[in-house]
Design a protein with these regions (language model features):
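Generic structural motif
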Residues: 4-8, 24, 34, 101-103, ...
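Immediate N-terminus of the mature polypeptide
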Residues: 6-14, 133-135, 139-141, 172, ...
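Carbohydrate-recognition loop of C-type lectin domains
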Residues: 58-179
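An aromatic-glycine-centered, glycine-rich loop/turn in mixed alpha/beta architecture
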Residues: 160-205
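Catalytic P-loop NTP-binding/switch module of NTPases
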Residues: 1-58, 64
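Surface-exposed loop/turn and secondary-structure junction residues enriched for glycine/proline
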Residues: 21-24, 28-34, 135, 174, ...
Length: 205
């Protein structure tokens, strides 16, 4: 199936949602998608383009440096966000882990697509066995109580919204491969939202 709208508008359609045959084929009575639609990407931001320009010189190498794999991974699709490359030189294997630009884990089609792209003979050295995977999730919970100044009681609803936004921002910030769970960053963001004091039970060091 091909989405008629550009960008990510066609992502997230559940299995079975795509069932209309546009170009009829002999002996094909019906069709249906078996996985959620994905891979559609919006135009990359200026920051993402600047990062690819910075990594571009690494693409000239055919020796398989880290910068080359980073560049090609981000070139594959504008939705590719954080990328980490690891290698076992003795085994000749290269492992590429990545997240989408919103911090979420990629779906199986995205993983397979990037792996096939990086395994192209024009990209990988002949001695490299490239494997692409989504990183393992690290689960954590958020449990906190915040207090505001009595003089700010008329702003309680606005502060509540700001605190919720601060928590969401922290969750997005935390979605980086290899980044430690940092409670101090959460407390810092919640305090900046207008709180007087924060008691943070989880996450904890």
């Amino acid at each position: 199936a091909v989405c008629v709208l550009p960008g990510s508008a066609g992502n997230g359609l559940a299995p079975g949602a795509l069932a209309e045959i546009v170009d009829p084929l002999p002996y094909v009575a019906n069709v249906s998608n078996i996985t959620a639609s994905e891979v559609g990407a919006d135009t990359e931001s200026d920051g993402e383009l600047a990062e690819r320009i910075y990594l571009f010189p690494g693409s000239y190498s055919t020796a398989g440096p880290e910068a080359s794999y980073l560049y090609h991974a981000k070139t594959y699709n504008a939705n590719v966000g954080d990328v980490v490359v690891a290698s076992d030189q003795a085994a000749g294997s290269v492992e590429v882990y990545f997240l989408l630009d919103d911090g979420s884990a990629p779906g199986p089609e995205m993983v397979t697509g990037l792996q096939n792209y990086l395994r192209d003979r024009q990209i990988r050295p002949m001695t490299d066995l490239v494997t692409v995977s989504a990183p393992a999730d690290v689960l954590y919970s958020i449990d906190l109580v915040y207090y505001i100044n009595r003089s700010d009681s008329n702003r309680a609803v606005a502060i509540q919204r700001a605190v919720n936004a601060a928590v969401d921002t922290y969750i997005t910030w935390q979605r980086t491969i290899g980044r430690d769970i940092n409670p101090s960053k959460l407390a810092e963001r919640v305090m900046a939202a207008g709180c007087k004091r924060v008691e943070l039970s989880a996450p904890a060091f």
